[in-house]
Amino acid sequence: MRNGSLVGALLLAAGCSSGGGPAQPEGEGGSGATVGSGGSGAQTSGAGGAGGAGGASCAEFAMPTDVDCAAPLDGVLPVDLRCTGLYGNFDQREIACGVLEYKPAVELWSDGAKKRRFVSIPKGQQVDTSNPDAFIYPEGTQFWKEFSVTGAGGAQRLAETRLLRKTAAGWVYTSYVWSEDEKQAIQMQNDFGVTDLYGTGHTVPNRDQCQECHVGRADYVLGWDALMLGSGAQGLSAETLVELGVIADASNLALTIPGNEVERQALGYLHANCGVSCHNDLPEAAAHDTGLYLRLEASELGEVMATDAARTAINKRPAENAKYEGLTNPDPANWYDIRPGDPSRSLLVARQVLRGFEGQMPRIGTHKVDETGVEVVSRWIQEMKETYPPPGP
């Protein structure tokens, strides 16, 4: 089904009316899927009754009466984005009171899409941050991520808004696809996602792809941890969350990535883009069986060589199930996950620049190479000198 026809059919099925103009993104790819079960689109109170996104003016959320806010028969989230509690005034794209906007210290690569992120914690509830590596969220927590991409004529347009909500039975998640005129955002209700949305090249992931990334995190949320709320974060920090009453104590969250600037940039990039979701030691993580772990843990931040990224990658041969199709040299004997001083024989870099093959990294959600990310990781490997092991043969 063509993208326009698909979204049009969803709009018609939802009984939705038109109205409102496009949002103005301030930043830079689940569809109808559920984990467990839970209630429908209930209103949330927000983080302790705090103001709107980024401290801006806000409007109180009220369940709209001009659209059907019921969840589809096979789901628990409402069909229309307006019913989720993100906007106090949808027509003006005014964020609801208690919804907080944030930007993590390191952003996940999404083919250059501009993103805005929002969170709502139920009033009177707190996030358990006693384990800085694994935050636990209260029931009713909601995270939204809005994607804007380059459309016809080079102008930015809204593509999708993803939602994660924690229910009594677990996390539920979906993606709301914006109509071509950007006046409505309706929940994806197929199992396939959308490829090349409105000719922009943007892909809305299918439900399996959403789960593949998020199950690699203890409580499902990516991009919200001690490091991502630390140096470089915008909108929210651990300290501001204490002030808002969202967390009780930030004393164990003052973590710093080890090393010089080059090392910190590379380790932070690999943590956010590879380690948080897939390359970590959680049994559910998609790349757990590779033995290549790139997530930064609080207990290993004393020095670079103590990190999983260094211990499991430097001078390590790739896993037996590694994919080499599409590489200029497909001989496994040529490769190390990281070969100090030699990005050209480091499979980590080769996968970063690979696209269109199973071995590309990130494996899903991207069709374009992150040139900046490649440069960051390559420079780290190139500068591995005195304090690093000598390169393997």
Residue ranges and their predicted role:
Residues 1-3, 7-63, 392-393:
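Ser/Thr-rich, Pro/Gly/Ala-heavy low-complexity intrinsically disordered linkers and tails
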Residues 39, 49-52, 140, 341, ...:
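Glycine-centered flexibility sites
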Residues 57-70, 134, 153-326, 330-393:
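Sequence context surrounding c-type heme c attachment/ligation sites in exported
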Residues 61-131, 137-139, 144-151, 157-188:
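Conserved small-residue
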